[in-house]
């Protein structure tokens, strides 16, 4: 007798990850979800000039949420980000890696 697994297949990797610094203390991330079946996304960050430069998980979002706000960044520090989908079967490959450096001064929006 052949038994089929009831576990879902691994989710596909998120694609088109982008990062935008909003002032000196926030970074907004956005990506495209590829396919269904994920239970959420893990967001990881690394600091460029740190001794280890290893990625560390900084947050999670639920399924069909394709954005994240990192409010724990410092101005003039370069950060790398990547995102991974997950489900009961395991983790997807990572998305593309993006880098962003928040500016020293807050971003000013033009007046209307």
State where each predicted segment sits.
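Pro/Thr/Ser/Gly-rich low-complexity, intrinsically disordered linker/stalk tracts
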Residues: 1-38, 75, 88-112
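Residue-level recognition of well-ordered beta-strand positions that form the cores
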Residues: 30-32, 44, 84
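Recognizes extended acidic, P/S/T-rich segments that occur
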Residues: 41-76, 88-96
């Amino acid at each position: 007798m052949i038994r089929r697994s009831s576990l879902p297949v691994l989710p596909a990797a998120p694609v088109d990850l982008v990062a935008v610094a909003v002032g000196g203390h926030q970074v907004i991330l956005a990506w495209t979800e590829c396919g269904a079946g994920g239970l959420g996304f893990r967001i990881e960050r690394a600091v460029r000039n740190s001794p280890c430069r290893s990625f560390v998980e900084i947050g999670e979002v639920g399924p069909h949420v394709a954005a994240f706000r990192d409010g724990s960044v410092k101005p003039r520090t370069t950060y790398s980000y990547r995102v991974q989908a997950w489900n009961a079967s395991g983790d997807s490959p990572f998305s593309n890696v993006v880098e962003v450096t928040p500016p020293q001064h807050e971003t000013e929006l033009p007046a209307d």
